[in-house]
Amino acid sequence: VLSAADKGNVKAAWGKVGGHAAEYGAEALERMFLSFPTTKTYFPHFDLSHGSAQVKGHGAKVAAALTKAVGHLDDLPGALSELSDLHAHKLRVDPVNFKLLSHSLLVTLASHLPSDFTPAVHASLDKFLANVSTVLTSKYR
């Protein structure tokens, strides 16, 4: 459960991301593919090279979903219900991959927002991404 302080930290940090959300989403995906090569198996039809339009496009989708989640911190299940259905029933993504992408996103944010990425903000973003991951995997059961 996100505390009021966590919610404030998440909103403030995502606000700093601003217009770079799609760019950071794509960078986090590239980072995940490089650091955890097995994640590439879910994207056999993608050009996974650096800067590919497909990775940028999916990065924008990831960023848009996270932006939506930040705007609905008190109702993540409602805000992410369709994505949860998609990932559980159609794409059948192994739940561990959400943790890997979350880690890659945290590293990406820390590299771009070093002065804003305090231990408290890091902890809040980590909790937020864990909650998002939990929601996205909730329909696997």
From Swiss-Prot:
Gene Ontology cellular component annotations, sorted alphabetically: blood microparticle; haptoglobin-hemoglobin complex; hemoglobin complex
Gene Ontology BP, a term: hydrogen peroxide catabolic process
Record's keyword annotation contains GTP-binding: no
Residues where O2 binds: 58
Function text: Involved in oxygen transport from the lung to the various peripheral tissues.
Quaternary structure (record): Heterotetramer of two alpha chains and two beta chains.
Descriptive protein name: Hemoglobin subunit alpha-2
Organism: Bos mutus grunniens
